[in-house]
């Protein structure tokens, strides 16, 4: 049954008269002996109707008819007594009548809400004072989840109410079921004046909720810069860890949520142990996780490392690896990290293949991702295998950049899954007559079912091809990042093109690497 909507056909005539404040009709009904305790579909009796609708005379008549404690304290199906309803609407006179008739100022609803809490919620300071005069308790739980009236006043930013409650002895450090204090609530909702009053009264600026979050952390998370400023000037500790794993700080919250002004306040005040320290998490990760380019650049400009530390919490070896996990376009994040010197490795190439960012893959090759020691070769190969169907978009670039084709050819997963065209193309970057025995064995097995591969393996590499391999092997790795260096060699253009495998690319109907780019390139370089 719906306890929030009043059905008129369930309300008694006495209840309707009280609801409408019709004293004349109510008097007639009472003289006829009509009952005053008939409830409607919500459990509302006439006394509830009169209290809610501010029908003072009707209420007095009802109490005169039945002044018993049971009637005065009768509750609706939601646990509201007449006092709750009167206070919720800010009816001072009704509240006074009920209190003098014996209503309990500390009675709770089914949701554990007290009249004092409802008075704070309604913003009626006069009703609040009336309840306090009649013994309302300012401490303890006043609503579900353990919120106290001081929590609610802090949430609403009602300075007069906060001062009154504190004056009456309200505990400034009272906690709800989650360990949250009124100061935390004020910080969360940006109530600067509430915070100022609470701090002036001695509230602990470094209090922590059950999840270890502090007022400074929540203010930073919500971007309440003035609140952050007040907390810092009042002694809040920006290095107090705000989670069980002892790594999360206010600076992380600001960076993740994109609050640049707040971040600007926290950067110079936060200890740099979080930057690259072991078992910590750099706020650079937080900025990347939130996709906050401006915050990321701010951190890097202020000296935070673009490589941070290996992040076991998120399962990434670097912020650049994390960037690939974003659902949105992450090229801007990648650009910023590279701008400030992020180190590239094979994992980043692997993620380019995983997410089919082939132009970014080519850009990473040009930036020297093949020059660093490889520690994740198996992971790279696994993604390379999955990207075989689109090999023309990335494999030529990889091999032309100096990648050793034997790394692929030594992998059974690559050889077993690759088409004949892919295997033959890969072999073109090697001396296929001098392959390791294990590779020869795998390829011979494949060749048994492939005439084209069998024919290629049986052929003898030309002298010009072997010379090409030797010349390319003699070049420094950085000279193979692009075709610029080779085009500058004192050789005929035809030989330059030969060193760049132009005839192999043409035979395989592959666009020249310089032309095989799309709109993604400009974003990735």
Curated annotation (Swiss-Prot):
GO CC terms: cytoplasm
Coarse class of the protein's main subcellular location: cytoplasm
Tissue/organ expression: Widely expressed; highest expression in testis and spleen.
UniProt keywords, alphabetically: ANK repeat, Cytoplasm, Repeat, Ubl conjugation pathway
Cellular location(s): Cytoplasm
Family: Belongs to the ankyrin SOCS box (ASB) family.
Protein name: Ankyrin repeat and SOCS box protein 3
Gene: Asb3
